[in-house]
Amino acid sequence: IVFYSVVTAFMVSHNIFNVYMIPYAMLPIIIRVFLDSRTAFLTHVITILICSISLRFPHEFILTQLAAGLVAIFSLRELSQRSQLFRTALLVILTYAAIYFAFELMTENGLANDFSKLNARMYTYFFINGILLLFTYPLLFLLEKTFGFTSNVTLVELSNINSDLLRQMSETVPGTFQHSMQVANL
């Protein structure tokens, strides 16, 4: 929470890039993988509310980030395959784009007749945000190794019967291998 608050305040005070480039949905994904959805949602809401203090348009930021965080949490029920993170990043990008487009339609100088007023740079920021969101997977690995956590992805990788150790075990001691696989599936 502190990291996102400091980065947001720094970017706003020094007018560096745009805060929509920061992957705020990374925090609820990490917390969702190791803990649960409620904790991830509460942490995300607290982070977004704290970060919105330093912004010019906090209501737009809060609604956009809240929607993206909810999509990230609920599209990632259990991280058991790497492809799920790609799908989540794509859904977050689409959520950002849809919410921002809706805000653009609601403004006074709306896009009712002229889509050339659309700020294409914002959609680039959303895409960069999605790319940065893909760095969640290596960060999860780093957190697992650093703090000794175990995620579902690690358990799936450990139960891969094509690994050298399990293949050797199935050839030399098939009974122990079968028993180990049954216990692992429990």
Model-derived features with residue positions:
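Generic detector of multi-pass transmembrane helix bundles and their immediately adjacent loops
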Residues: 2-177, 181
